[in-house]
Design a protein with these regions (language model features):
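Long C-terminal interaction/binding lobes of large macromolecular proteins
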Residues: 1-256
């Protein structure tokens, strides 16, 4: 036996989704918490892995290593849960202090500030709306006011979000109109009047009356739980107070 045996402690992280929006058979269906291991030098190696960084999968690999339950696929995590888990891992591994460079909207100066991650993450609970039905598989069904189409929507997973980003980047690279609003709606629409064909759904969204489109976006925004990462900072130059959206990137784990 080595004199340096060390068993990493574990801790529980609350899921903002409360496991409600995962389909039956998913390891997080109905689960309100996930157990993570404490970060070690092994996880730091993952954060600096050049191959993972180039492929854009470093955060998924980090969570995969930290999960006690290895049956959980990080790519299948809802974005809200994924971000909450990464926040918890960052605080557990490096503490809650997060140094940032902020731009003052009043005097336009750039200044250094420190954000307390314990107070940064704010979870907005899902709302109940008339006419919106929670289906047994974690999806939502809503009837649109103008067309009367019955639309089924899902909360985005990390894989869905990555796929949306790739679609928009490919369109931009090929000088194709990005239609970002349409693509964004398309990313969370599962079916319209029972039709699941992607081309048909895209066409329907493109021609959807503005009133229907607005309601659909509001239902997605309000009826699924969401996370905000806004912090109030004070400019060190002019002393003006501003609300700043803290960017969530890999540098989140690299700050000194």
């Amino acid at each position: 036996n080595s004199a340096f045996n060390y068993i990493s402690p574990t801790y529980l992280v609350d899921l903002p989704s409360k496991g409600v929006f995962y389909p039956g058979g998913h390891p997080l269906n109905g689960k309100t918490t996930v157990e993570l291991r404490e970060m070690t030098a092994k996880e730091e190696d993952i954060l600096f892995n050049k191959s993972f960084l180039e492929r854009g999968i470093v955060l998924e690999k980090l969570l995969q290593s930290l999960f006690v339950d290895k049956s959980i696929d990080p790519a299948s995590l809802l974005v809200i849960d994924k971000n909450a888990l990464l926040f918890a891992a960052r605080i557990n591994g490096y503490g809650p202090e997060y140094p940032i460079k902020a731009n003052c909207p009043a005097c336009l100066s750039q200044f250094d500030s420190v954000v307390d991650l314990n107070t940064l993450l704010k979870i907005r609970e899902k709302e109940k709306k008339d006419g919106v039905i929670l289906l047994s598989n974690g999806l939502l069904s809503v009837t649109l006011p103008v067309t009367k189409w019955v639309v089924v929507i899902k909360p985005l997973s990390g894989a869905d979000q990555d796929n949306l980003q790739k679609i928009l980047e490919t369109k931009k690279k090929n000088n194709i109109d990005q239609n970002s609003l349409i693509e964004n709606i398309r990313s969370y629409v599962v079916s319209i009047n029972g039709v699941i064909d992607g081309t048909s759904i895209y066409e329907a969204i493109t021609n959807m009356p503005a009133r229907d489109s607005k309601l659909l976006r509001n239902v997605y925004s309000d009826c699924f739980p969401n996370i905000t990462t806004t912090s109030q900072v004070v400019c060190t130059v002019c002393r003006e107070t501003a609300d700043l959206e803290v960017p969530f990137t890999i540098s989140f784990f690299w700050s000194k």
